Amino acid sequence: SGKWWNDAFEAIGYDNAFQIKVLPDGAHPMDVRYNMIHWVHRATRGWSYGGAVVDPRTGEIIKGNVSLGSLRLRQDYLIATGLMAPYTDQNIVPSAMRELALARIRQLVAHEIGHTIGIQHNFLASTFDRASVMDYPHPTLNLSSDNELEWKNAYDVGIGEWDMLAVEYGYQDFPKGTDEELALEEIIQKGIQSGMTFITCLLYTSDAADE
């Protein structure tokens, strides 16, 4: 699911630039040449994180680090248990429970990778259908004609329209002589005209920018 971001970079002209591979044998996870996804076991509940090593002089992202806790899968499995209530006298795990949990993990991987490339939460993305993996999604369920829950589209697959826009804004190269400030404003206006909105958990003010 981390490769979902490749769609956004290909859209602005970077073919196959965003790749995910198994760490080479003998490589150290702290080697700055490698962006890392760490699968971490915890004995207690913990958050997943997406962070980066950044050059403070230029803002360049040098290395991305994602940490995914093992208990998140258990949490998602319990959500599925609560929704499906598969309680019988047999120890059978419905495949839909497993698929629901794995679908959420795939979405989470893309979310945390989004942070490593500089993209913040967008807690308004859910007001524009499924516009971003950078929101905190709940499972979207439907009722069938016989009043059974349908799980097929509980979580989305792929990044959303807002994610595509954010990558375009942050990474698009412009031809020499382009008024970049105007070009970036046009990207913002394109999103607004499409109905996309943005709110995050960080506060930016003009005073903070001046400091």
Language-model features and meaning:
Residues G2-A110, T116, P139-L143:
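Metzincin-family zinc-dependent endopeptidase catalytic domain
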Residues F9, G59, L73, G118, ...:
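Aromatic-residue detector
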Residues H111, G118, D207-D210:
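Alpha-helical hinge/cap motifs
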Residues H115-S126:
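Catalytic Zn2+-binding segment of zinc metalloproteases
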Residues S126-S206, E211:
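Conserved catalytic/binding loops enriched for acidic/polar residues
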